[in-house]
Amino acid sequence: MATIQSETDCYDIIEVLGKGTFGEVAKGWRRSTGEMVAIKILKNDAYRSRIIKNELKLLRCVRGLDPDEAHVIRFLEFFHDALKFYLVFELLEQNLFEFQKENNFAPLPARHIRTVTLQVLRALARLKELAIIHADLKPENIMLVDQTRCPFRVKVIDFGSASIFSEVRYVKEPYIQSRFYRAPEILLGLPFCEKVDVWSLGCVMAELHLGWPLYPGNNEYDQVRYICETQGLPKPHLLHAARKAHHFFKRNPHPDATNPWQLKSSADYLAETKVRPLERRKYMLKSLDQIETVNGGGAVNRLSFPDREALAEHADLKSMVELIKRMLTWESHERISPSAALRHPFVSMQQLRSAHEATRYYQLSLRGCRLSLQVDGKPPPPVIANAEDGPPYYRLAEEEETAGLGGVTGSGSFFREDKAPGMQRAIDQLDDLSLQEARRGLWSDTRADMVSDMLAPLKVATTSHRVPDSGPEPILAFYGSRLTGRHKARKAPAGSKSDSNFSNLIRLSQASPEDAGSCRGSGWEEGEGHTTSTEPSAIPQREGDGPSIKDRPMDAERSGPELFDPSGCPGEWLNEPEWTLEGIRGSRAQGLPARHPHPHGPPRTTSFLQHVGGHH
């Protein structure tokens, strides 16, 4: 076990936590206090010396903040020797990427995404007060503090790429931000400000919900292409001012076009750069609104009678997507600021409280935010933001102290009838998705007792009140590991293509497929996932769609209609002489009155007609 020593303290190196481009991070024991710390170790050379000087300058600026209230990592000290630089920080548990990896990149529920977003926005608001741009916000740089004691309490780390705004605003082409989270103004070469971090946070929020990066471009062209295909082209005045516009766009040859610019095709980019564009997205979205429909987000629209918990979660997801749309805008001046985002209904929970206060989902969401903001030895700060106040700080809901997780207050709240807003809009979004996949289930956090009761009503409603699906569900555009980088094209499941021959339809008065000699196991017989055509059916069959009567055996012979034989009936009344053919003819020949079905003789209408006919 190695030991390193500064002027004031001594550290025992326990293990190496990770290695990166510029150095490694080790876990150490601080002898003076007995606490575990994280030590960032870099080689002592001229290049890394410039990086260290920049990070130290930013860390000294951030040192004036309360790291717990500002949600930034606590910096302890810096020292060096002839070979290496050492930066000592508080030890945190793991970053969001590692947390996603442990959970197989399962989608994170909206209420946990809000808990993370709230804290990162508070950090960005504090950094803005110091005129600091973090410039490298991503899941790897958002650390979970202690997931067991304080679920989803996070802090922002790594100020190695951070900059003072006044020092970088005039840099022509700064190479900042990881590509997946790089703002359009950096990609296009436009003036930028601290709102580049807001774009990155919007991408992180979408990634936590999707379980996959929203825009995982292999290069800057792919990055711009992904954004254009989901959000449309930037406005012409942006491209006119962008220094790098010609790298990704070209002039529109049609003079009457509404936009004088158009995105270069993949073939154009390949011809110019000899670099083949790649498709690395998991979901090919036609708009940011379609984020709402991914990973079970549209399930409530397929319930005939969704319960209150499902409605609350669905409304929360819609509110989250609205905030993401405000964060991911082409123009930075239209992008929401950190302080304004803290007052957004999704973060402040005002909309959730007003419409779904009586639900357990709201109570769990409120408690999750309070736990994430609570600092040891201090009372938890209020969560719900005052929308009328300018500063991004908070006031507590009046009923918060009386509303516990075991029960909720408010007598009339349970009897309000809520309706899922915008159901038809969500259905239309589902129909617009270009690719689809079976829905992945939501997963709970490490404290399963906090979410099991909330998810149970949704499962019951989903199984007991199901109506026909409103539209297709999204699938993987590419399927592979985020770590290995190997991507495999996923085959389209049954039901994703239409049957152009309509051979799976059975017309009335025609024989069924087995009568025509089809083999056992056909789609018509099994009822789900198979058809008699070589292509799958356009309408996926669900449980209960097949015939409810037991199928006729395959070897049964179809016969024509049989004549009725009255002699086979067990009763004797049909064999009486009056009902035989000879008896009927004989009764007519003898002029006997016809038998009437009425027990008391012919009806009065018949007697009247016979009377009138006798006079004529």
Swiss-Prot record:
UniProt keyword annotation of Amino-acid biosynthesis present: no
The UniProt record lists the keyword Cytoplasm: yes
UniProt catalytic activity: L-seryl-[protein] + ATP = O-phospho-L-seryl-[protein] + ADP + H(+); L-threonyl-[protein] + ATP = O-phospho-L-threonyl-[protein] + ADP + H(+)
Cell location: Cytoplasm
EC number: 2.7.11.1
Active site: 136 (proton acceptor)
Residues recorded as bearing Phosphoserine in the entry: 512
Compositional bias annotation for Basic and acidic residues: 542-560
Residue numbers binding ATP: 17-25, 40
InterPro entries: Kinase-like_dom_sf, Prot_kinase_dom, Protein_kinase_ATP_BS, Ser/Thr_kinase_AS, Ser_Thr_dual-spec_kinase
GO cellular component: cytoplasm; nucleus
Residues covered by the Protein kinase domain: 11-347
Protein keywords: ATP-binding, Cytoplasm, Kinase, Nucleotide-binding, Phosphoprotein, Serine/threonine-protein kinase, Transferase
Region: Disordered, residue numbers: 487-616
Catalytic EC class: transferase
PTM: Autophosphorylated.
An individual GO BP term: regulation of signal transduction by p53 class mediator
Similarity annotation: Belongs to the protein kinase superfamily. CMGC Ser/Thr protein kinase family. HIPK subfamily.
UniProt function note: Protein kinase that phosphorylates TP53, and thus induces TP53 repression of BIRC5 promoter. May act as a corepressor of transcription factors (Potential).
Protein name: Homeodomain-interacting protein kinase 4
Organism: Rattus norvegicus
